[in-house]
Swiss-Prot record:
Transmembrane segments: none annotated. InterPro entries: Hist_DNA-bd (IPR000119), Histone-like_DNA-bd_CS (IPR020816), IHF-like_DNA-bd_dom_sf (IPR010992). This is DNA-binding protein HBbu. Keywords: DNA condensation, DNA-binding. Belongs to the bacterial histone-like protein family. One of its GO terms (cellular component) is cytosol. It comes from the Bacteria. It comes from Borrelia turicatae. The keyword Disulfide bond does not apply. Disulfide bonds: none annotated.
Amino acid sequence: MSFSRRAKVTKSDIVNQISLNIKNSNEKLEKKYIRLVVDAFFEELKNSLCLNNVIEFRSFGTFELRKRKGRQNARNPQTGEYVNVDDHHVAYFRPGKDLKERVWGIKG
């Protein structure tokens, strides 16, 4: 599989695609309800990460917080000014086996 250009997929695109998938299954669910579920999902994901929980979706991947060590003399790329950066946490995603296998052969 090869791509000429990367497309950006937004939350609205995901809601629209879910809506199409539901319509194809002959079920009815309005987009506003799908959006509520998607919004609640992302909010819960953020809340769980803020509680330092590990969020695992089998075959898809795992979200977790990782501690990034602070450092001195980091450079602000916009101003060129040197600043100190404190220890902080960052969100990290580790893809699952099925996701890794699925995207392995993608070129471009």
